[in-house]
């Protein structure tokens, strides 16, 4: 497995080198201007992503050499290291028959072009998040995160036993891409702000980095949503290009240095109660595999989906303590009246999305029914147990 490493970040590290946190935005723009050149290079590399034996082969000689492009900075804690680990797991489970070279966002293609190059068959694998594909696949938002929606364990139950995964793959099929759940950040935080939020009026006019359905909800509240890659967030927040941002949770947010650029850290993360990461597989490349290697691809994604959720839950609680106790971050809860307004706006956004096209309507109906049913069960079980146990 080849992993590009401009710098090294161990999975146990919290801080990120200054070279990442303070990367100039114009450097990223220069990378974008090289886009045509990079895409031309993809064609020259096409021979690398080949299956050496026929699709029907089940023998030990079957070999594939694939490339994975991601939406994350190199080795970025959580997201980036998850992509590396998935590539390694594919190689190990296949006994070396699947070799994956990993390219971070911007190394081969821009971070937000991952879906496009996999769809075009130029790249075999992508590691990204459904929230970025609003323009290409409106229904994808419902697999990324739904404001005030299901938590990770509820979401996974819907995917595997409620028909969610079948709908997800049906939604992406017209683009020639097969999505698999390959990670979950867990429940996220509400974001970093350079001013206190005491009422809905305080949101009006703010420029905030917030993608997905959460961004559409915030827009209804008067916020100007901005979508920029993670590598640009720190500089944008520090220079005042944006007034606020949400990213993930304490572990990733501290790694990105966001506590150095904003004073207030808000919760709950109503906009992303469950943050899905996805492995995008070229349908053509996947169909060229033997049944055995197809099973290995699916199994590796399932394993990573579970593993990284556990990692985020473990690391986030430790990182939050460091942020508050050592860095003096001001932790704040969104006022109840603000959450109520945002919840009402969320329903409007979801209903508008469901009305856009039949696929979005089917996904939303399935999601909503399952969320209602499993929510009633979890309030009786996990919710009541958590409340009853107090502090052990």
Give names to the regions the model predicted.
Residues 1-32, 43:
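N-terminal secretory signal peptides
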Residues 29-32, 38-155, 165, 170-392:
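N-terminal secretory/targeting leader peptides
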């Amino acid at each position: 497995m080849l992993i590009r490493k401009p710098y090294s970040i161990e999975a146990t590290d919290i801080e990120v080198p200054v070279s990442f946190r303070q990367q100039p935005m114009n450097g990223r723009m220069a990378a974008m201007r090289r886009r045509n050149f990079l895409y031309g290079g993809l064609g020259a590399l096409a021979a690398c992503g080949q299956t050496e034996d026929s699709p029907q082969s089940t023998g030990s000689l079957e070999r594939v050499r694939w490339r994975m492009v991601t939406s994350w900075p190199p080795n970025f804690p959580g997201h980036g290291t998850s992509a590396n680990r998935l590539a390694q797991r594919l190689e190990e489970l296949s006994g070396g028959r699947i070799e994956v070279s990993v390219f971070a966002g911007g190394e081969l293609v821009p971070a937000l072009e991952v879906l496009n190059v996999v769809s075009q068959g130029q790249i075999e694998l992508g590691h990204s998040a459904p929230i970025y594909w609003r323009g290409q696949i409106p229904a994808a938002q419902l697999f990324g995160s739904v404001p005030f929606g299901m938590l990770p364990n509820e979401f996974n139950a819907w995917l595997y036993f409620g028909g969610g995964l079948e709908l997800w793959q049906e939604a992406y099929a017209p683009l020639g891409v097969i999505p698999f759940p390959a990670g979950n950040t867990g429940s996220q935080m509400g974001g970093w702000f350079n001013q206190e939020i005491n009422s809905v009026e305080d949101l009006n006019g703010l420029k905030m980095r917030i993608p997905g359905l959460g961004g559409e909800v915030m827009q209804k509240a008067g916020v100007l949503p901005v979508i920029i890659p993670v590598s640009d967030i720190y500089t944008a927040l520090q220079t005042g290009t944006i007034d606020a941002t949400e990213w993930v949770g304490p572990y990733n947010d501290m790694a990105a240095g966001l506590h150095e650029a904003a004073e207030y850290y808000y919760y709950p993360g109503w906009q992303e109660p469950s943050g899905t990461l996805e492995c995008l597989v070229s349908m053509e490349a996947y169909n060229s595999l033997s049944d055995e290697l197809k099973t290995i691809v699916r199994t590796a994604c399932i394993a990573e989906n579970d593993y990284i959720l556990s990692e985020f839950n473990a690391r986030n609680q430790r990182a939050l303590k460091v942020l508050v106790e050592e860095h003096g971050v001001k932790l704040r809860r969104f006022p109840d009246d603000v959450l109520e307004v945002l919840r009402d706006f969320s329903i409007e956004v979801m209903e508008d999305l469901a009305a856009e096209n039949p696929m979005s309507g089917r996904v939303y109906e399935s999601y909503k029914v399952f969320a209602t049913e499993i929510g009633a069960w979890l309030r009786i079980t996990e919710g009541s147990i958590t409340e009853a146990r107090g502090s052990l």
